[in-house]
Amino acid sequence: MNLEKLFSNKIEIYQNLIFTKTDSRPLGFAQEQTKDVFSEKWSEVEDGNQKEELYSFQKEWFLDLYGFSDEEALKLYLSDKKIIVDAGCGLGYKSAWLAKLAPESIVIGIDISESIQIASKNYEEIPNLFFYQSDIADTKINIDTIDFVICDQVIMHTENPDHTFKDLSSIVSNDGEFACYVYRKKALPRELLDDYFRKATFDIPNDKLWEMSAQLTELGKRLSELDIKFESPDIPVLGIKGGTYDIQRFIYWNFLKCFWREDWGKEMCDATNFDWYAPSNAKRYSKSDFEKMIFENKMEIISFHEEDACYSGRFKK
């Protein structure tokens, strides 16, 4: 496969890295801040002791998010995909997973952050895997060329997610599919706090955000250790659903993200909390918002998933 034919700009390839002679749009201030945040976050995750637990969880969750019963079903699905793009690949572990499942395919992992350099080094032995540092809203990839485009847990962090969705869906081939995930809007008290941090993060140094993230991890841990369940009333005006809750999950979903998973350990949980509060770009969606974006780009829903955290699915032209 001649990779040069995929791009509207001239490219150069050095080992497993793609470079473009680019005239890309300058990043907005918020996108520059978000880029820096994720460069720092992925560096911390790479140095963490329990990233394999994170990777394992993310792969299993990926199957649920995009309608695959198991890894074999995903492998079969990928078997006729010549070109796969993982837009917003971070450290590249999912790109590498897909490349191993589909050894006859070309997989291109794209990310705006410096994580691309780490990914390139970590997976240089996979011959069908390439990495490309770029804004995923401005990839310079030609339209109608990619058999499977993935934007998993990333599109909300771009300057204009609706524009990014349009750009990524446009590069999907006529027989291809686009897999995308968006944050789901939460209860009103949590939304108000989250909106505050989208602006406040400009004025809070990253070291203070890491400190706060560690404190939120500790809060989540202590709340979980209480092991208290209670019955909450339904409060529809605030968007709070009634039902039986663990106290940590009730606060988490409705008031304050204080992530904690014992099997991930403190470092990965700190990074997860940092991931939420540090980026200035982090849009959330209602179901109708997400569906509108899909249909406005003339895409058909093949698979749709919803849970408290998100909406996701696979779509085709």
Positions of the model-derived regions?
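Conserved class I S-adenosyl-L-methionine
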Residues: 177-227, 246-249
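A structural helix-start
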Residues: 116, 158-162
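Conserved N-terminal segment of class I S-adenosyl-L-methionine
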Residues: 1-144, 148, 152, 281-283, ...
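A short glycine-rich, Lys/Arg-flanked "PGG" loop and its adjoining helix->strand segment in the class I
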Residues: 162-174
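Residues lining the SAM
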Residues: 152-155, 181
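Active-site micro-motifs of SAM-dependent methyltransferase domains
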Residues: 138, 156, 185
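Glycine-rich phosphate/pyrophosphate-binding loop
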Residues: 232-268, 279
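C-terminal lobe and adjacent flexible extensions of AdoMet/dcAdoMet transferase-like proteins
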Residues: 256-317
